[in-house]
From Swiss-Prot:
Belongs to the Lgt family. It comes from Beijerinckia indica subsp. indica (strain ATCC 9039 / DSM 1715 / NCIMB 8712). Pathway: Protein modification; lipoprotein biosynthesis (diacylglyceryl transfer). This is Phosphatidylglycerol--prolipoprotein diacylglyceryl transferase. It is an enzyme of class 2 (transferase).
Amino acid sequence: MPLMLVYPAIDPVLVWLGPLPIRWYALAYIAGLLLGWAYARRLAAQPVLWGRRTPPSALEVDDLLVYAAMGVIIGGRLGYVVFYNADFYLEHPLESLSLWKGGMSFHGGLIGTALTIGLLAWRRSIPLAVLTDLAAAAVPIGLCLGRIANFIKPELWGRVADPDFVPFAMVFPGAGSLPRHPSQLYEAFFEGIVLFVILFIAIRLGALRRPGLVTGLFALGYGLARIGCEFFREPDAQLGFLFGGATMGMLLSLPLVLIGLFLVIRAASPKLETA
């Protein structure tokens, strides 16, 4: 019998405070926002990284946290409702408010955050690219923690894998008896750790001096990482494969790749150098 890893079966509830469950899933969102905020504050406090650009003040970074949190929660939920299960929520509209039952979309959260950051930029008269570059640098932190929470829950598991070739395949509770790719951990690594390192190095090499470059690198990097990981992730049961083996995650990530590529090419123009 081929060897395979045993799913650790971590309780999705970290602790009960009376009748209130404190779940890893919720803590991942909170920790992602707070750690991202702390990292953004650190970047904003280093003017040398920004060249002639004016970085946000500490108060503006605090505002960015609040606006980003609203965008993530509202956009993430609406994105899941619209992109992944519209038929169900049209029949049961009140269920769209049941956040505790799960169901969030990264792409929806990204759209929501882009809108709320745009609102903040307009209200505070801050160049939009200053805020998006700062936010993009911090997002991989939350992505990594969120994917680990998906693994603990467990949800969004991978496709069936042959343990002879994938020795780290495992059987997930609720996913049948066959071993599967731990695709949540693939995404935590590539969308979180690898992307964070790429952006960290780019920033140290002067990426924040070029408006939109960090934003573009994030969009391009995330889009490519997500499309790659989708080949190992089980499609959502209510959607399945859409056409030609494509999944909803792939289709939603393709525009990110194109937008990211455009922003990177645009930011590389000598006219945008602000060193």
